[in-house]
From Swiss-Prot:
Family in the record: Belongs to the AAA ATPase family.
Name listed for the protein in its UniProt record: Proteasome-activating nucleotidase
Coiled coil: 23-58
Region entry Disordered, spans: 1-22
Key word DNA-binding present: no
Annotated domain remarks: Consists of three main regions, an N-terminal coiled-coil domain that may assist in substrate recognition, an interdomain involved in PAN hexamerization, and a C-terminal ATPase domain of the AAA type.
Length: 409
């Protein structure tokens, strides 16, 4: 073997060794990178479980409501355990968020505010009907020209043109009370007001505010008015207000006293806001004679509007509204139908049009005829007979309508 060939062999082995070591180094580096990533992931997971253990072992906080802010470091709160407390404010809590009514968390000893909790509403309040922008306007309400004028002046005008009242130096009504028989359009009027003012429509039924627990009804009233202010401009419509605003009696059960507390909270809320605010209260009842006089005094529900059963002209307008989109045969005489329906409410007239549509469907037709309308009037009137019972006024109106139907037939 020559010297040159021996040197070449050693050089080849030396280069081959370098190549193998380079591969091993690359593999080891890849393993290091992989293990480093795994270590970071495991560290994050460890921190997560440490935090979870800390949460599980940490004592619970006490919920409280701020009553008064004394200074940046001391606040009066009402704790969920009962008593009012003067507590300190932890360093990390923003003092600007501590306002009367704010919900806060106290430490387990109840001596320090450690956090300000987000505001919330009772589930009953959130479940109430809230319609952001109702698609109902005054043109959709028939036979109530005088009532529309009164409610426009009392509610719509102060919201749209408050400067008129400021210039005159007068206050518009804070609340409007609608009263009249069922189905005459009280809720429809309230929705039309919300539609005309582009306001949020909040509908509350009085019976929902009657609660068996002491203080619950009053708390619900406070939360409803708070929701109305946050959604302003808003129309707060309280239906069946007689459930919480009936006349007070000296002798009553604990349930009666709770209803009275709810009514007093309602009066306090009405007394507490500016008449020119963008929150207007409209209430409705079928029994004005049951309402407590304190509710009706000036400064509260001081505009009382009767919504009666529609007149002949009103019934004709209502029928025109409900048949606006219906396919009617040329022989349908709405004026004759209006004469047949004396004593009918707006809801009854809508039921007549719907029932006439069903009559047409049963015949296999797609057009409503006069005969369909007359049969529908008879069916709705029969239902009114059962519903009217022994009321002599309703019976007299129905008898008059029966005589008219007999004449037409």
């Amino acid at each position: 073997m020559t010297l040159s060939s021996a040197g070449g062999s050693r050089s080849h082995r030396h280069n081959g060794g370098h190549s193998e070591r380079d591969v091993e180094i690359r593999i080891l580096k890849d393993k290091v990178r992989s293990l480093t990533k795994e270590k970071i992931s495991l560290q994050k997971e460890l921190e997560y479980y440490k935090n979870e253990i800390t949460k599980l072992l940490s004592p619970p906080y006490i919920e409280a409501v701020v009553l008064e802010v004394i200074d940046d470091n001391r606040v009066v709160v009402k704790s969920s355990t009962g008593p009012n407390l003067i507590v300190n404010v932890a360093a990390g809590v923003d003092a600007r968020s501590l306002k009367p009514g704010a919900i806060v968390a106290l430490n387990n000893r109840g001596s320090t505010i450690v956090d300000v909790l987000p505001g919330r509403y009772d589930p009953l309040v959130k479940a109430m009907e809230v319609e952001e922008r109702p698609k109902v306007f005054f043109k959709d309400v028939g036979g109530l020209e005088e009532q529309i004028r009164e409610i426009y002046e009392a509610v719509v005008l102060p919201i749209k043109n408050p400067h008129l009242f400021r210039e005159l130096g007068i206050d518009p009504p804070k609340g409007v009370l609608l009263h009249g028989p069922p189905g005459t359009g009280k809720t429809l009027l309230a929705k039309a007001v919300a539609g005309e003012t582009e306001a949020t429509f909040i509908r509350v039924v009085g019976s929902e505010l009657v609660n068996k627990f002491i203080g619950e009804g009053a708390r619900l009233v406070r939360e409803i008015f708070r929701l109305a202010r946050e959604k302003a401009p808003s129309i707060l419509f309280i239906d069946e207000i007689d459930a919480i605003a009936s006349k007070r009696v000296d002798i009553g059960t604990s349930g009666d006293r709770e209803v009275q507390r709810t009514m007093l909270q309602l009066l306090a809320e009405l007394d507490g806001f500016d008449p020119l605010d963008n929150v207007k209260v409209i209430a409705a009842t079928n029994r004005l004679d049951l309402i407590d006089p304190a509710v009706l005094r000036p400064g509260r529900f001081d505009r009382i509007i009767e919504v009666p059963l529609p007149s002949l002209r009103g019934r004709l307008e209502i029928l025109g509204i409900h048949t606006r989109k219906a396919k009617m045969a040329p022989d349908v005489d709405l004026e004759a139908i209006a004469k047949l329906t004396e004593g009918f409410s707006g809801a009854d007239l809508k039921a007549v049009v719907v029932e006439a549509g069903y009559n047409a469907i049963r015949r296999g037709s797609r057009v409503i005829t006069m005969d369909d309308m007359i049969k529908a009037v008879e069916k709705v009137k029969a239902a009114l007979d059962k519903r009217g019972g022994g009321d002599p006024f309703i019976r007299a109106q129905q008898k008059s309508g029966d005589d008219t139907i007999a004449t037409v037939i």
